[in-house]
Amino acid sequence: MYSYHDRVSYSRIDKDGLLGVSDTVNAMQDCCLFHSEDVGHSALDLLKKNRAWLVSAWHVVFKRRPVMGERFTVHTWPYQFKGIFGCRNFLMETPDKEVLAYADSRWFYFDPSTGQPTKIDDSEKAAYPTEPAYDMEYSSRKVKCPENLTLVEEVDVCQNYLDTNHHVNNGQYIRLAVNVLPIDFEVSEFRAEFRLAAKMGDTMYIRTTSENGKFYVVFTDLSLIHI
């Protein structure tokens, strides 16, 4: 297990003074990337070898979002490698071990030079010893969405949406999805499926609907987010 200590900063809180939903995902992503840095397999080093990890799905459950100034720790560990896929858990908790959030994430190993997934290198798997999966509900990577969607926004991809893979970072989709939810809607859990990465100059057409108390946000032809 790898752990990273953090504190809620003002730049990451929402209107209620809580760590934002997308900022929670970013904190988990940061922990994962620090893990890679500290075992000598950083994202930038992988790119030099024409390799990268891309996320294909998130399932995040919130127990409580921490408030401005509150300290917290994010833990992460992989629990499975198979073929091109890797699965990784996250746990966010207070210094007193109160669970704030936990997550499952699915990733695939990628060759940027070909634009195709590729088998995980043995050295990559060896750098991340697996541990038992977290005790949570595990769902399918794919999210089923109703068809009665309403177009609510068009977003042009600009530079500050991109990460080092030159794609829109997964946290940006989460942020944009939350922005089109009812203003007082509290996200207690979400699932996100990423199908195709948006790039600089693309236009994302955001459509929404709700059904049985669940909100669905779809980035047309790019990714599907279920909140």
For the regions a language model picked out, list residue spans one by one.
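Hot-dog-fold acyl-thioester-processing enzymes
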Residues: 1-55, 102-104, 110-185
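Glycine-rich acetyl-CoA-binding "A-motif" of GNAT/NAT acetyltransferases
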Residues: 99
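Generic intrinsically disordered, low-complexity segments enriched for polar/acidic and small residues
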Residues: 7, 87, 107, 170, ...
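Conserved small/polar residues in nucleotide/adenosyl-binding loops
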Residues: 225-227
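Hydrophobic beta-sheet segments that form the core/acyl-binding groove
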Residues: 60-95, 189-222
